[in-house]
Amino acid sequence: MDAMQKTIEYTSVSRIAGPLMVIDGIEGIAYGEIVDITTPNGDKRTGQVLEAREEIAVVQVFEGTSELNTSETKVRFTGDTAKIGVSYDMLGRIFNGAGKPLDGGPEIIAEEKLDINGYPLNPVSRNPPNAFVQTGVSTIDGTNTLVRGQKIPIFSGSGLPHNKLATQIARQAKVRGEGEQFAVVFAAMGITGEESNYFMDEFKKTGALEKAVVFINLADDPAIERILTPRIALTTAEYLAYEKGMHVLVILTDLTNYCEALREIAAARNEVPGRRGYPGYMYTDLACLYERAGRVKGKEGTVTQIPILTMPDDDITHPIPDLTGYITEGQIVLSRELNRKGVYPPVDILPSLSRLAGNGQGEGKTRDDHSKVISQAYAAYAEGRGLRDLVAVVGEEALTERDRSFLKFADAFENSIVTQGVDEDRSIEETLDYVWDLLTILPREELKRVSDELIEKYLPKK
């Protein structure tokens, strides 16, 4: 678009439907272009081109289409895509879903203005995810180890304490090593006012805000803003990582609300729906978010992602968790059964998995016994869980002494490893020591996954 076209104001709005506006008689317009809109009473609004064909543009209005009409509304196409002004000074600040200050502080003086959609990374320019990120949560650090540059979602359900876990991770997360800079970018989408107050209070009172950038999109904010929020958050994270050399953990919650916004916009455009009414391009759209995690050759910083989503009806085969699982490198699953028992965080380690855990475990990263002792504990816990079903049928009296020891181990594992205080920050060494303590419950001959050398070095003497 040339300079002359940027000055043209169109009044050829032909149709307004929901958050969308159709403009006729235009030319030289591109997909994703930002639009300045003047309402009949002179107010300014912003929109984005969702579709451009022949002489027609379909524009999504960020602030909604109330008070707009087809005869007096003026539209100007800017020729620019959606951009966010980024700066190191964003650390310690809270913004709304569109990147405007929400904490009463001044506007950010941008060091750079970046396209919120990011830029495609050549796969050859990526380094494999590597090195340990400590969250202070045993069920993540021990069994589902998080690695710098990884993307691993948390699959939750309505009413489960994923918000509490998200703030705990944001507060406690750190990278090990001298001189390493670490930051958290936290983006909440489609949340209630109560949840917003909870997040802001938690970040402020615990001091976590000092190393964090927070973006909050409320449930009553426009759907298009919900689409922008994670992109703005990831653009901020990429700037801090690749321009400032920081290791950045991005927490996105709740991706289910994001996907509902995708469905709402697709329905307004009369698109042919895919599975359960979601647009057919939802897989591609989610991949555009998740694939922005990683490590880049020649850059010091990294971007690590923990997207959180609530599974509708606790259905892990629902399109949102299903498609997410194809793109990401594992999953952390919260259990309603454990939550009913009063276990916090209610992480069920059996269906949970970190496919890159091995890249962050071992000597020089965590400890030399990490992978072996966790493998032993995982196997013992799985056997103990299976024995619970048997006990429900035949009773505990029918079990052998060996079986009873595994049953006891499973109970102890849930009570001392899985269960953890919301303010309890465990180092990886503490987590592994707790696991070794529990292994004393089992007969020595059952410790088949750890070497004699590791047993002599770490297993407490009875």
Curated annotation (Swiss-Prot):
It holds the Pfam family ATP-synt_ab_N. GO terms for molecular function: ATP binding; proton-transporting ATP synthase activity, rotational mechanism. The keyword GTP-binding does not apply. CDD domains: ATP-synt_V_A-type_beta_C (cd18112), ATP-synt_V_A-type_beta_N (cd18118), V_A-ATPase_B (cd01135). It comes from the Archaea. Has multiple subunits with at least A(3), B(3), C, D, E, F, H, I and proteolipid K(x). This is A-type ATP synthase subunit B.
